[in-house]
Amino acid sequence: MRADRRASEALDQHRREADEQGWSVVEVGGGGRRALPFAHTVGLDRSGHPELLLSGRGRPEAEVLLGSLADEVLAGRRFHVGDVLRSGPWPPLLLLRVSAPEALVAAQAMRGSDEPVAALQVVWADDAERWPWDPAWVTSAQEQQLFARAPKVAEPRTFT
């Protein structure tokens, strides 16, 4: 009962933030032996844009990165599957369609509909600009869980 109340209060807080600024970032604990913590936006769905999900980055970095991308969406930018973003202090970022939208529990609850919420995963490259599905990808203390399928062709569109 106490956990349900905390979850409800947290959802209300994210709803207020989304009402005020158009989005909020929700952090989700790993919750399983192999699951890693991740973060996702709530509120972008209201503007007709998929929510954004990021795994493998710490809380402050996830909030800054997702918040920056969310602000771009609210300013009129639209992100698409296959876009590669190269800006700011981050490594190249590839956007993929989330194939497990049930992971975005808060976004689904805010949507208030049984229709799965659409989302894009912000996948980050390693220092050599390789993606996690590349056998040469260098893992470090930071690993990312994929909520999307790796592309069959590694020829994404690049945007700055």
Each language-model region and where it sits:
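A short, structured beta-strand/loop element
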Residues: 38-42
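Acidic, proline/glycine-rich low-complexity IDRs
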Residues: 1-33, 44-47, 56-160
